[in-house]
Each structure stands twice: as structure tokens, then as C-alpha cells.
Amino acid sequence: MFWSQSKDNIWIVGHRGVRALLPENTLISFQKAIDLGLNGIETDIHMTTDGQLVLHHDDTLERTTDGSGKIENYSYAELRQLDAGIKFSPEYAGQRIPRLE
């Protein structure tokens, strides 16, 4: 049996953090998920040209950052220059793509 009906089996997971409230896959979005008492977060991982693992849903940058192109074509230092909050709202300008540490 894979599932028994019990409240103990229910987990609430933030998809890319709390992407409806804050820029997805940013540290502030992950922290808000923790603050709200969520049981976990779901994110995606990509590798940069210098072998760093970064947290970002898309394999390209256009939708959520001020950059363009594929993550795999950037070094971590180059990605850190991009703004991962500005497209969500100017209020969140300056958010960065986080690295998996």
C-alpha cells in the first residue's frame, strides 16, 4: 500500500518557493515558504559552464531575468550579474539566481 488516508501523509510544498507571492526560485521566495510553514520546496537545478549548480526552473533566462540565452552557456559569475526579481516586480529588483550549496 502506497498511501493511507491520514493528515500525517499530506505535505505542502512550495513550487519554486512561493512563486505567486515572490520571484520564483529566489532565496526570498524559499525563505517565505519556510516562514509560511511549508514542508518543502520544489525547484530545478542547472549546471553552469564552470560546473556550478544553480536553482532555476527554465533552461533559458528570458522569462524570469534580465538575461537571455541558456543557463548552460553562462558561468556562475556571469549569472550572478543578472536580475532574477525585476520581471516579477520592480520592488524585487536585485534578486539573484541562487547556487545550490
Predicted regions and their residues:
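Conserved, mostly hydrophobic/aromatic
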Residues: 15, 33, 44, 79
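N-terminal amphipathic alpha-helix/helix-capping segment at the start of soluble metabolic enzymes
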Residues: 1-16
